[in-house]
A protein has these predicted regions:
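Surface-exposed assembly/interface segments
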Residues: 1-280
């Protein structure tokens, strides 16, 4: 909806003024205004927003590729973020962003070649009941109301728990309308690992809290957090010690960084406790 330099915003009114009449302002409102139904003890009050020119191309596939390239261009100057939301929800855009998100996690070979790990997680909305994507690191939620943004509302409602492990199913994002779906359509969305707001026994909640590949959202986010925390611990050890020898003491020092990350993950519920040993 127009090029604009990336900036950090902490105030919804400032966002509305900077992006008057644009989808991003409505998405920010859905993200911020979750205080009535969230189970978290806090709310999201800090976001990074960047504006890009409308993707160009002769068809939706080319435009989707241009969108991904624009995101990659932004990453060249600012890669210090984790979750991506966009105002584009066309089929080709969602498919391209799902594929992009999966590719942001470097392979062991790429890490060995010196590539940094700045893996991302994509949350997107679709209005297509038959959308089929199976990418890792991507969460798609169905919504049939043009003026509602279930992807932003979902992140705003459950995201504040991060990095604590939390079930993304059975959550009730504020400001969403339950989509008009038949039983067969709900079953199809479940089989496709597309999340959606539903009503069962007169209770509204999101089913099923999964990524497009079927992995639970909290499992994916937990794995990412462990990798991030472990890497930071190891870099701190390397930077704070003039020499780390190939000795028992050196190995123990490095191992301490690894176990510190795992213990932290256990405290956050990412790694389960053994009921007998009470260890992660």
């Amino acid at each position: 909806e127009g090029a604009k330099d990336v900036a950090v915003y902490r105030d919804l009114d400032v966002i509305k003024e900077a992006f008057t009449g644009k989808k991003v302002a409505a998405m920010a409102e859905a993200l911020f205004e979750q205080g009535k139904t969230t189970l978290a003890e806090t709310l999201i009050r800090k976001v990074k927003i960047a504006g890009i020119a409308a993707p160009s191309g002769s068809g939706e596939t080319e435009k989707a590729s241009a969108l991904v390239q624009a995101v990659e261009t932004l990453r060249e100057t600012d890669d210090d973020w984790y979750i991506l939301l966009t105002d584009q929800d066309g089929d080709e855009a969602v498919k391209a962003l799902c594929a992009w998100a999966e590719a942001t996690e470097p392979t062991e070979a790429e890490l060995g070649a010196g590539e940094e790990d700045h893996r991302k997680l994509y949350f997107g909305r679709t209005q297509n009941k038959s959308l089929a994507v199976t990418n890792r690191r991507s969460i798609v939620i169905y919504g049939d109301q043009d003026e509602e943004y279930p992807d932003a509302a979902y992140v705003g409602n459950v995201g504040p728990f991060y990095p604590e492990s939390v079930t993304w199913k059975f959550k009730r994002p504020q400001g969403l309308t339950v989509p008009d779906l038949t039983n067969a359509e709900r079953d199809a969305l479940e089989e496709a690992n597309v999340n959606f707001l539903t009503v069962e026994y007169k209770r509204e909640y999101v089913k099923n809290g999964v990524c497009a590949d079927g992995e639970f959202i909290d499992v994916q986010m937990g794995a990412d957090y462990i990798a991030k925390n472990m890497r930071e611990n190891l870099y701190d050890i390397f930077l704070e010690n003039p020499t780390i020898g190939y000795t028992d003491a050196g190995f123990a020092l490095v191992a301490a960084g690894v176990f510190s990350a795992l213990n932290r993950a256990t405290d956050l519920g990412i790694i389960a406790l053994d009921p007998e040993s009470e260890q992660g």
